[in-house]
Swiss-Prot record:
Superkingdom of the source species: Eukaryota
Residue ranges flagged as DNA-binding region: 12-80
Protein localization: Nucleus; Chromosome
Annotated transmembrane regions: none
Location of region: Disordered: 81-100
Gene Ontology molecular function: DNA binding
Protein name: High mobility group protein C
Start-end of Basic residues biased regions: 90-100
Main location: nucleus
Length: 100
């Protein structure tokens, strides 16, 4: 969380991979076709769809990913020039076991 005196905006977000762009594009349709499926099951179904699509379809998402990556790199350069390198965010590990 940002404090009030922290005037530095958040750095640009990393671009999504080609698969995640595909997932984003297909999620609602797969969910509509499988309304009772869990999120993990939906993701597996989308992964199967991804494996089944042709190279031409994958190329479309890879191109979108490349464009997003180029924009991210440009935005990141501008951010670093203005604010310096962003601090590394510490990953918060979620403890799956309940603590006693």
């Amino acid at each position: 969380a940002k404090s009030k005196d922290d005037s530095k905006p958040a750095p640009p977000k990393r671009p999504l991979s080609a698969f995640f762009l595909f997932k984003q594009h297909n999620y609602e349709q797969v969910k509509k076709e499988n309304p009772n499926a869990k999120i993990t099951e939906l993701t597996s179904m989308i992964a199967e769809k991804w494996k089944a699509v042709g190279e031409k379809e994958k190329k479309k998402y890879e191109t979108l990913q490349s464009e997003a990556k180029a924009k991210y790199e440009k935005d990141m350069q501008a951010y670093e020039k203005k604010y310096g390198k962003p601090e590394k965010q510490k990953k918060i590990k979620k403890n799956k076991k309940g603590s006693k």
